[in-house]
Regions:
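A short, N-terminal "cap"/entry segment at the start of jelly-roll beta-barrel domains
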Residues: 1-32
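Conserved short histidine dyad/triad with adjacent acidic residue
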Residues: 19-21, 31-51, 70-73, 80-84
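A generic beta-sheet turn/junction motif
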Residues: 28-30, 52, 91
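Short, well-ordered beta-strand segments in beta-rich or mixed alpha/beta enzyme
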Residues: 36-40, 60-62, 97
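Glycine- and acidic-residue-biased ligand/ion/polar-headgroup-sensing regions
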Residues: 52-64
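Aromatic/pi-system hotspot detector in well-structured domains
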Residues: 60, 75-76
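Ligand-binding loop in jelly-roll beta-barrel domains
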Residues: 70, 81-106
Length: 106
């Protein structure tokens, strides 16, 4: 795949399961890592779940809550694969950079 470079301003914001997403580096059927910017509104309420891959969130704006703990801009959250977490909320809205490694069942 080589080198991929993208500017956030060149990527469309699309509606996704919970909020809106800018897919900076989309995964190819789970065979490659992915990076995205997620925009979550105050109505975001993602139930407890887990993934068969590691993931990280970096809070860019606003505030998000995971497992009842609030994280504000500048916070980096690492979640190991197969770790149940949630609910995930953004009571005042939030914008996060999300990285997920390549893994099964994405």
């Amino acid at each position: 795949m080589g080198v991929i470079a993208v500017n956030e301003n060149d990527v469309k914001l699309v509606k996704s399961g919970h909020g809106q997403t800018k897919w900076l580096v989309p995964s190819k059927n789970g065979a490659s890592p992915e990076m995205m910017i997620r925009h979550w509104g105050p109505d975001t309420n993602i139930p407890v779940h887990s993934h068969p891959y590691h993931e990280m969130f970096y809070v860019l704006e606003g505030e998000i809550e995971i497992n009842g703990v609030a994280y504000t801009a500048g916070a980096c959250i690492y979640i190991e694969k197969d770790t149940p977490y949630g609910p995930t909320r953004a009571p005042k809205g939030g914008k996060v950079l999300r990285y997920a490694e390549a893994g099964p069942s994405k």
